[in-house]
Amino acid sequence: MKAGALELGEGSKTSIPRGGVNRGISILDFILRLITIIGTLGSAIAMGTTNETLPFFTQFTQFRAEYDDLPTFTFFVIANSIVSGYLVLSLPMSILHIVRSGARASRIVLIFFDTAMLALLTAAASAASAIVYLAHKGNAQANWFAICQQFKSFCERISGSLIGSFGGIILFILLVLLSAVALSRC
């Protein structure tokens, strides 16, 4: 008789209810959003405060490198700032999902905007990484020289700022997947 009961879909009484699993997913979603805020905001601040000045022959002639010398880095800072702002604004919805684990419409909205922010962050990080690669390696065919031999501090900071942004991309992928799993369980 027990086999017949299992065939009809009756499970054991120790199974976790769906609301509990969704609540756990919502708590993980909230924590991942906080970590992503730290990564993207840190990347924007690190890139936005990057500059280095080198003297050339005399103290009166100097070469400088700043993030806003290249529009790609400006786009990187703006995109990371927008994503950080969005994440801060999405925290109340994430808290709502912890309290009301069955909320479907707000999860759909979060999936939509999370995907849009993922695309923006990916575009900014990819464009900036191409410029960072050129700064490190140069391109002999285009007569672009590697500047990282002279501007070491500048290159270290712009390379480091990419880490938080690419970490944010990975976390956004996890956020979208978590929201989709939670939505499928509602």
Curated annotation (Swiss-Prot):
One of its GO terms (cellular component) is plasma membrane. Residues 1-26, 96-107, 183-186 are cytoplasmic. InterPro entries: CASP/CASPL, CASP_dom, CASPL. Disulfide bonds: none annotated. Residues 48-74, 129-161 are extracellular. One of its GO terms (biological process) is cell wall modification. Its main location: membrane. The chain crosses the membrane at residues 27-47, 75-95, 108-128, 162-182. Keywords: Cell membrane, Cell wall biogenesis/degradation, Glycoprotein, Membrane, Transmembrane, Transmembrane helix. Glycans are attached at N51. Pfam families: CASP_dom. It is a multi-pass membrane protein. It is found in: Cell membrane. NCBIfam families: A_tha_TIGR01569. Regulates membrane-cell wall junctions and localized cell wall deposition. Required for establishment of the Casparian strip membrane domain (CSD) and the subsequent formation of Casparian strips, a cell wall modification of the root endodermis that determines an apoplastic barrier between the intraorganismal apoplasm and the extraorganismal apoplasm and prevents lateral diffusion. Belongs to the Casparian strip membrane proteins (CASP) family. Homodimer and heterodimers. This is Casparian strip membrane protein 3. The lineage of its organism: Eukaryota, Viridiplantae, Streptophyta, Embryophyta, Tracheophyta.
